[in-house]
């Protein structure tokens, strides 16, 4: 966690063009910072979090949202990208159905990103998740022997439209 490795900006250079579409510099926090603690080695969390095969069983709500369009990409420069198109069809989760039904159609994002979920990550455990209406940033880290934590926060552009408030 300390050392002379490349900066996060350099590692995420490949992601810069896509991430910049989301106007992160203009976003504000939309929730309080969160932390979860686990009784396991932090490398276990990072390994599982970076392997897409766990998504259908480990993240049933995300899988319900993006379904079979979910894909993982391993890219150069130590980053990976997962993505899926947010399905406009019927969802098992009522929360997902409500999200899809209320997410405004008008967006500052290009059409290619208006209904896409994107997950950029790099070792050790730093993640930027992009939704059409918000982003989430989190990281995983050790806090002791066989003890780990994950901490993050969500951000969004100011948007007073009732549909956007409902979607969020």
Q: Could you say what each language-model-derived stretch is?
A:
Residues 1-168:
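C-terminal catalytic domain of Rieske-type non-heme iron oxygenases
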